[in-house]
Amino acid sequence: MIEKVVVFNAPPGSGKDEACKWLINKTFTYDVGDTRYSESCHHKEFKGKLFAITREIFSVSKDEWDEHYTRELKEVAWDKLNGLSPRQALIFVSEDIIKPNFSKTYFGESLAKSLYQGINIISDGGFDEEMLPVIEAVGKENILVVKIKRDGCSFEGDSRSFLNTDKLGIMETWVDNNSTLEVFFTNVVEAVEGWLNLEK
């Protein structure tokens, strides 16, 4: 069995989380040489480790965190985070504590160690450095970056950006999300199926 990685790389509000939830319910069939694989998808996030560390630093339980890390509240200041919003707290821990003191690849290393056999769907790509351990773990040929276009969505005010796939040497595809969810999901599935069945 092979580890495959599909990384969604898109601005907030563009539909990447919805696409990942849709793919988790899918099974993909593809051939490698003379072997046919039928794989389900597993959801992974670079920020999984970051969430755990941030909760620990601010002494916040998982239940408390989950109550506040919602679309409505994640931008709202919270006294348990010393007046930071949950999103600001994540950026503070990542950019001011972990990366300067450990490595810019820290969260990528953590994710690479936790990959499943089969198809891993990563919903929060946005830093080139975090991709390096993943590339080392599975190989460039086993990674697809899905970038999403949606009107009105940008990385403005976000520490993430579009991955430099040319520099990283990995494949990318663009999917438009300016129509219905049905069309969007169909395009995402076709993009992943097309990549899985490419001659490698």
Regions found by a protein language model. Give the residues of each.
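Extreme N-terminal starter segment of soluble prokaryotic enzymes
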Residues: 2-6, 41
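Hydrophobic anchor at the beta1->P-loop junction of P-loop NTPases
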Residues: 8, 122
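Small-molecule kinase domains that catalyze NTP-dependent phosphoryl transfer to phosphate-bearing small molecules
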Residues: 9-12, 105, 110, 115-116, ...
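Conserved lysine of the Walker
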Residues: 16
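Hydrophobic positions on the alpha1 helix immediately C-terminal to the Walker A/P-loop
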Residues: 19
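Post-Walker A helix-loop "phosphate-sensing" segment adjacent to the P-loop in P-loop NTPases
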Residues: 25-42
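ATP-dependent small-molecule kinase phosphotransfer cores
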Residues: 37-41, 46-120
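Short, well-ordered beta-to-alpha junction loops that form the rim of enzyme active sites
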Residues: 124-127
